[in-house]
Amino acid sequence: MTETKAIGAKTDNWDEGLPLGNGFMGSIVYGGNPLKITVDRTDLWDLRPNETTLESGFSYKNMIRLVKSGRDEDWREYRRLFDAIFMEKPYPSKITAGRIEFEFEGCRDIDYSLDMRTATVSVNDGAERIAEVFTDYVTLVGVVRVHRECSYKLNIPDYLSGTEGTCEGDSLSSRVTFGYPPAVVRERDGFLWYEQKTHTDYRFGIVTCRKGNEIYYTLATTDDDGDYIGYAKKRLERAAEAGYEKLHAEHTESWRKYRRRSGVKTGDRLIDGTYEKCWYLFRSCSRKGFYPMPLQGVWTADNGSLPPWKGDYHYDTNTELSYQAYLKANRIDEGEVFVEYLWRMKPEFEKFAKTFFGTDGIIVPACSTLDGKPMGGWPQYSLSPTMTVWAAQSFDEYYLYTGDIEFLRTRAYPFFRGVGKAISGIMEEKDGRLFLPLSSSPEIFDDTRRSYLQPNSNFDLALIRYL
């Protein structure tokens, strides 16, 4: 498949736009005139912990007690401690950074198309090409080349600095805001950017640089450098010195090499097209040395709200299934970031096993922040210990496909041993058999009392037997 077009001539909906990504930064191209280009990155987070997770009652032992008591007041306390925390405050959460809006002179009929071979979006006004956009896979910056006079501005989400926005996901909707100081927009020497302070030392902003008919952009944070704006400007200047043609040639070559690693042709246009799109999206939002894809990958809903489900890591098979097929498809460079991340988070997972479950070993919060901490949510899965086994299986599969004995010795076995130690540490013996004190299956019976199944669910049983 050579290219796929947006639905209709144009779309005003962000979730019908065309996705671009380089495994670090993502953009969605949508709109008309103005043309909208979102700017996001996986690691843009407000990582302040919800204070409820620091209470002494936020523990597995207390959760068991509250579930089994049968009293309404205890169930309300259970909901307060473990469920309501997901949406009662805007943090911790992925952050929406905003977008760049382009106004073209005399545009009447804008549409756009995505060439997946080159990961490039072409923008047209009728039969005339007016712009191209790509997120460079080599330099990690966004690049726009325009062929018609245009102006552009930055659109910053209102909910960041005090105007309430909608918090979506987990069947709840409330008015939320981070309450940050208003962002400061600045323009100087061909650069346009904004600076956003938060309630900690963390800061971020979209930075753009214009050189003739080429506009370069990035999203920088204080994780990059204390002088994150200066850091971003230097990156953009280097990209601008190279120029569109050179960057695009190297970017296209990297995608050509990726596509050559494997391919499937069934003769069915729908199946083949879906296959191409899936592996295009996979590389767009996953790459070695960075973070694995959370719920929305490198993109975030551009609707003036917190990301759906706060853009977290959902280990109730959401995250795992995103990486289910990369080994068979020979996409190891892009896929192994998942096991690398889990290993890097091992100390945090060991801490969670100890502080929440009261056991030694490794347990992964099934609804997790970027830095591996619990977010709460429906406790039946967000705080289920067996979700960890799904995550651990990725180590098993990596070893089986690569045959890497050193990986087995230094990564897979230690991780599995830690998970096994933790799971066995919380199980209870009855009549010569081991049972989990609480057992569920993801999202069956939602977040009601019925969702705890007796004695143990097939879901939990299958995972524990595998372990």
Question: How would you describe each model-predicted region?
Answer:
Residues 282-286, 340-353, 414-430:
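Long, well-ordered core segments of solenoidal/helical folds
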Residues 246, 250-254, 266-273, 277, ...:
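Extracytoplasmic/secreted proteins, especially bacterial periplasmic and envelope-associated proteins
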